């Protein structure tokens, strides 16, 4: 088979690289950052020795056993239960919204059945087919909980009114009528014991894989490489608008700024992530990184305040911004991508979707398997 070029070394690109390499296909990975792993990259904080998720919290969770088995080949996963808290109107609540949250908020002692009836009575039953985040929230939890927990936070995160955000975003946020405070409900949940970076090092440790880090590419660069180095196919996992030199304009993404600070206290906030739901607090959440590795012991603590803002060309894009009204610019890029014969677009940025890590891996496995099947010699 021909050599393959992969742009990006996050889970999408790295998974394809490994699977192709095991089929004796020569693979070259190019990444514009000076490290592998994409946004999953982590490193030891020099001052405290705590392992820091440099680009924000990454907890692995999935119901897909094949994906779980795949990542466990390259790193030992420590079971991990994600328990988050929310700071709203001067009170600390459990997230996701559960029976404890409901009883605390309404100052009640309701049973699960009673809580279901209460929330059902609060919901706006005139909304039959919610299209926006706001409609989804009003229909299923009512105005009280919406205004307290689901208005200010997404407005800060996405930079727009919740009525402009698609309803699908809220479907990622569960509501429970028991006291379960595990944020995720998936069968498999964990964090690599040694960190994500060593996992990626193991994943990409193969004689058929080579790297070039710290190099940006676009459509013209890729065409030159295809010609000069005889690549048979390209898998691209970067921002699709950058790839096409913003031919149809820049797509909307959100980027994140992190403000690092230290505490002499061994435990600063009592949980891994504290979300700040009030609109007048400029940051969305605070992450205390030592909670990612409770099996380790460190003096003091290192934390990140997380600020969300609109993404410029020189920023790192994190979240694609999908609008209820649609996106004509994305439609043009999507059509152009479909016309490519030797380039496959993979991952969150290239396909302009909000994807969890396990979905990126699942789709990458499918892409690799299809390529191998179609190129058997």
From Swiss-Prot:
- Quote the record's cofactor note: Binds 1 FAD per subunit.
Q: Which InterPro entries match?
A: UDP-GALP_mutase, UDP-GalPyranose_mutase_C
* Residues where FAD binds: 12, 31-32, 39, 58-59, 348, 355-360
Q: Which PANTHER family match?
A: UDP-GALACTOPYRANOSE MUTASE
Known pathway: Bacterial outer membrane biogenesis; LPS O-antigen biosynthesis
- Please give the biological process terms from Gene Ontology that the record holds: fucose biosynthetic process; O antigen biosynthetic process
What chemistry does it catalyse, as a reaction equation?
A: dTDP-alpha-D-fucose = dTDP-alpha-D-fucofuranose
Report activity regulation: Inhibited by Cu(2+), while other divalent cations such as Ca(2+), Co(2+), Fe(2+) and Mg(2+) have no obvious effects on enzyme activity.
Cofactor(s) listed in the protein's UniProt record:
FAD
Q: What does the record say about the knockout?
A: Cells lacking this gene produce semirough (SR-type) LPS with only one O unit attached to the core-lipid A moiety while the wild-type strain produces normal LPS.
A GO term, aspect molecular function: monosaccharide binding
Q: What class of enzyme is it?
A: isomerase
Protein name stated in the entry: dTDP-fucopyranose mutase
Q: Decide whether keyword Flavoprotein is in the record.
A: yes
Identify the Pfam families for this entry. Answer: GLF (PF03275), NAD_binding_8 (PF13450)
| EC number(s) given by UniProt | 5.4.99.59
The family annotation for this protein states: Belongs to the UDP-galactopyranose/dTDP-fucopyranose mutase family.
What is this protein for, i.e. what is its function? Answer: Catalyzes the conversion of dTDP-alpha-D-fucopyranose to dTDP-alpha-D-fucofuranose. This is a step in the biosynthesis of D-fucofuranose, a component of E.coli O52 O antigen.
- The intrachain disulfides are none
Question: Which terms are listed as keywords in the entry?
Answer: Carbohydrate metabolism, FAD, Flavoprotein, Isomerase, Lipopolysaccharide biosynthesis
Temperature-related activity notes? Optimum temperature is 15-37 degrees Celsius.
What is the protein's species of origin? Escherichia coli
Task: Quote the cellular component terms of the Gene Ontology held in the record.
Answer: cytosol
């Amino acid at each position: 088979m021909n050599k393959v070029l992969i742009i990006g070394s996050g889970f999408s690109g790295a998974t394809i690289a490994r699977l192709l390499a095991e089929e004796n296909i020569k693979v070259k990975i190019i990444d514009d950052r000076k490290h592998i792993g994409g946004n999953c990259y982590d490193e030891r904080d020099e001052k405290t020795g705590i392992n820091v998720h440099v680009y924000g919290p990454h907890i692995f969770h999935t119901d897909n056993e094949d994906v779980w088995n795949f990542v466990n080949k390259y790193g030992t996963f420590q079971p991990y239960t994600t328990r988050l808290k929310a700071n709203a109107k001067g009170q600390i609540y459990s997230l996701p919204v559960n029976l404890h949250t409901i009883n605390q908020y309404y100052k009640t002692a309701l049973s699960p059945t009673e809580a279901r009836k209460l929330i059902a009575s609060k919901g706006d039953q005139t909304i039959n087919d919610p299209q926006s985040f706001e409609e989804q929230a009003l229909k299923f939890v009512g105005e009280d909980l919406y205004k307290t927990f689901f208005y200010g936070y997404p407005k800060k995160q996405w930079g727009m009114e919740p009525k402009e955000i698609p309803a699908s975003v809220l479907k990622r946020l569960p509501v429970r009528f028991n006291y379960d405070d595990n944020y995720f409900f998936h069968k498999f949940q964990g964090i690599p014991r040694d960190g994500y970076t060593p996992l990626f090092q193991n994943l990409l440790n193969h004689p058929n894989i080579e790297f070039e880090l710290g190099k940006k590419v676009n459509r013209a660069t890729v065409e030159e490489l295809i010609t000069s180095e005889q690549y048979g196919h390209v898998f691209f996992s970067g921002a699709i608008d950058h790839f096409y030199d913003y031919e149809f304009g820049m797509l909307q993404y959100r980027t994140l700024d992190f403000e690092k600070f230290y505490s002499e206290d061994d435990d600063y906030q009592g949980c891994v992530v504290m979300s700040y739901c009030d609109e007048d607090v400029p940051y969305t959440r605070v992450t205390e990184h030592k909670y990612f590795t409770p099996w380790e012991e460190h003096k003091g603590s290192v934390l990140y305040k997380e600020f969300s803002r609109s993404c410029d060309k020189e920023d790192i894009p994190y979240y694609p911004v999908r609008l209820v009204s649609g996106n004509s610019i994305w439609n043009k890029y999507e059509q152009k991508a479909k016309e490519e014969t030797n380039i496959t677009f993979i991952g969150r940025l290239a396909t302009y979707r909000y994807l969890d890590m396990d979905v990126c891996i699942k789709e990458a496995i499918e892409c690799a398997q299809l390529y191998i099947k179609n190129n058997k010699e």
